[in-house]
Structure formats: C-alpha cells, structure tokens
C-alpha cells in the first residue's frame, strides 16, 4: 500500500513543512531558480555551482536597486512621480561607477547629458556687473 492516500500526509513530512524557494532562503526578490536555469541553458560552462545563481541574483538585485534609487531621485529633482528612461540615463551618467559600468550602453529615449562648453557661455565683465548695480 501507498504511504499517501486521500487525506493522508506524505511520508516523512509534517503538515507545517512547505517548499521554500532559494530566493526566499537567500532573502532576495530576484528569481534564483530562473537565473540558475538561464545559466544552465546558456551553456556558459559544463557545470554550474549551487552558489553561483544565488550570488548572481544578489548582484543583479543590488544593481537594479541602485539604479532605481538614483533614477527616483532624478525624477524627484524634475518634480515628476514616474521614472522615465530620461531619469534612468541621468542617474547612470551622473554616477561615476555606474557610468563606467554602462559606458557603451545606449538607453532608448534617454537623450544626452546637458553640457555647454564654458567658452560658449556669455562672460560677465566688470562693466556689465557695474551696470546692474
């Protein structure tokens, strides 16, 4: 006879034991199982260690949180409540380390950083400043 039946409990398991995802065990929001599957199917290596997808998920989650925080600040500076690609671009390009990481990346609808050569700006001379007073 089977150890499990209608209304029966599985052998060796208690009623309170549930499956806990690897993301939950690691305290992450990013899907460790999906990243593990991508690493295996991507044929990056013959074998993938058990800690590799957890570590990669943690790194990706940290980078996403960092970019979102800076983009949120950029949106707030522009008095907007919604993050758009322009805010993401401003966040990345104004952060030295993220700019280095994403140096060759183009963000669609991001535009460019505002930059005017100081030589092209009108210079303030003593005559104009005295005339204002």
From Swiss-Prot:
Pfam family, one: Histone_H2A_C
Residues bearing PTM Phosphoserine: 123, 129
Subcellular location: Nucleus; Chromosome
Entry-linked Gene3D superfamilies: Histone, subunit A
Region (Disordered) residue spans: 1-23
Domain of life: Eukaryota
Post-translational modification remark: Monoubiquitination of Lys-124 gives a specific tag for epigenetic transcriptional repression.
Location, primary (coarse class): nucleus
Keyword GTP-binding: no
One GO CC annotation: nucleus
Cross-referenced CDD domains: HFD_H2A
Protein name as annotated: Histone H2A.1
Transmembrane helix in keyword set: no
Crosslink site: Glycyl lysine isopeptide (Lys-Gly) (interchain with G-Cter in ubiquitin): 124
Keyword field: Acetylation, Chromosome, DNA-binding, Isopeptide bond, Nucleosome core, Nucleus, Phosphoprotein, Ubl conjugation
Sequence positions bearing N-acetylserine: 2
Role description: Core component of nucleosome. Nucleosomes wrap and compact DNA into chromatin, limiting DNA accessibility to the cellular machineries which require DNA as a template. Histones thereby play a central role in transcription regulation, DNA repair, DNA replication and chromosomal stability. DNA accessibility is regulated via a complex set of post-translational modifications of histones, also called histone code, and nucleosome remodeling.
UniProt record similarity statement: Belongs to the histone H2A family.
GO molecular function list: DNA binding; protein heterodimerization activity; structural constituent of chromatin
Transmembrane portions of the chain: none
Positions bearing N6-acetyllysine: 6, 9, 11, 13, 18
């Amino acid at each position: 006879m089977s150890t499990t039946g209608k209304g029966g409990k599985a052998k060796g398991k208690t009623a309170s034991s549930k499956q806990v995802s690897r993301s939950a065990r690691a305290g992450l929001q990013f899907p460790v199982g999906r990243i593990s599957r991508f690493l295996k199917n991507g044929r990056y290596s013959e074998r993938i260690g058990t800690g590799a997808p957890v570590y990669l998920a943690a790194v990706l989650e940290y980078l996403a949180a960092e970019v979102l925080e800076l983009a949120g600040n950029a949106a707030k500076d522009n008095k907007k409540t919604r993050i758009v690609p322009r805010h993401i671009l401003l966040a990345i390009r104004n952060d030295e380390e993220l700019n280095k990481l994403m140096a060759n990346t183009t963000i669609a609808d991001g535009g460019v950083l505002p930059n005017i050569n100081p030589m092209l700006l009108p210079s303030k001379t003593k005559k104009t400043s005295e005339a204002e007073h």
